[in-house]
Amino acid sequence: MPHNTRVFVVFLVLTAILSACSAQGSDSSTNVRVTLTDFGVVSSSTQFTAGIPYTFTITNEGQVPHEFMFIPPVMAGMADMHGEATHNTALIEVNESQLPPGATYVLSYTFPKSVAGTDLEIACHTPGHYEAGMRIPITVR
């Protein structure tokens, strides 16, 4: 193979490699693992920054279906609030049909700047689950 052809082939290969690396690096979301159990929530992170994209991998390791919500904490005396009122206050919701026992759900979410500094929770509001402790406070800066 002539020298010019080899140089051109090497150039093409290097260009392809650099393009592939650049494409992989363009996804700047932060990965967060969330595990739902009967009846608890564990998250690999509870500190978030508004405007930053996150990819949440949510796994239901429990024996019953669960919900996943970013929601303001329930006020005293309102722990049994369910249904439409709860769902209307959630920033995002993954419902029970999407999180049966053993399921994993991947969610991409960016907290809006409007929620920076507010109290939020990751919670399950399936009847009785929130009251059983299925919530964890999170901070959004």
Name each model feature, range by range.
Residues 1-9:
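Bacterial N-terminal signal peptides that target proteins for export
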Residues 17-20:
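C-terminal motif of bacterial Sec signal peptides marking the signal peptidase cleavage site
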Residues 22-24:
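Bacterial signal peptide processing site
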Residues 27-54:
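N-terminal edge beta-strand
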Residues 58-60:
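Asparagine-centered strand-capping/turn motif at beta-strand->loop junctions
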Residues 67-71:
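Beta-strand signatures of extracellular beta-sandwich domains
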Residues 74-85:
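Short aromatic-acidic-glycine turn motif
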Residues 92-141:
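Extracellular/periplasmic metallocenter environments
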